[in-house]
Regions:
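Structured mid-domain segments that build the active-site/substrate or prosthetic-cofactor binding neighborhood
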Residues: 1-41
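Intrinsically disordered, low-complexity linker/terminal regions across diverse proteins
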Residues: 28, 39-177
């Protein structure tokens, strides 16, 4: 919470976490820190706007086709390996068939309709509201099956990942620009 409070708290927090723990020489200007908040608290909402402007559906379709072609080529390569036993090939093909591909942006956007950001409230009150909403959103998932379609990155993130525990790749729209 220190990052959202007065300069005294922000500076003390940076002195410890930024300088002492991370070796940073200076913190980002306040305006840059403030501009990063919507991205971190409303990632998919910002991502939806980003995608509408910069990543048309045809680009997603083209990337999905390219990945499917790579999967087909890899499947053929596995089938032709002479050093791999038939049982191991079958397991490799099974894993390849179960591979999850996330390209560009989610097929279903996160619903933020229960989150209220009130311009008449203080910045801190709105940060608390967003934090509470995020916590409740996570608690709603408790005891339910894992949503394998949920993204761990927003579309405007310039990064990509392979998650071996879920056997998925994710290439957000921004990394594909």
């Amino acid at each position: 919470a220190a990052g959202y409070l007065s300069d005294d708290f922000i500076d003390a927090s940076f002195d410890f976490y930024g300088r002492a723990m991370s070796g940073k020489q200076e913190q980002k200007p306040r305006w840059k820190r403030a501009m990063s908040v919507p991205n971190s608290t409303l990632g998919e909402a910002v991502g939806e706007m980003y995608v509408a402007k910069y990543f048309p559906e045809k680009d997603k379709a083209r990337m999905l086709e390219m990945v499917r072609n790579l999967q087909t080529a890899l499947s053929q390569h596995i089938a032709g390996l002479d050093w791999m036993s038939d049982a191991t090939k079958a397991k490799a093909q099974e894993k390849l068939a179960a591979f999850t591909v996330k390209i560009g942006y989610p097929d279903k956007w996160k619903d933020y309709s229960t989150l209220t950001i009130d311009p008449s409230e203080s910045y801190w009150q709105n940060i608390k509201a967003a934090s509470l909403w995020g916590t409740l959103d996570n608690l709603r998932k408790f005891g339910k099956p894992v949503d394998k379609d949920e993204w761990l990155m927003s579309p405007q993130t310039v990064n990509a990942y392979y998650n071996p525990t879920t056997n998925e790749i994710c290439f957000p729209a921004a990394i594909l620009q």
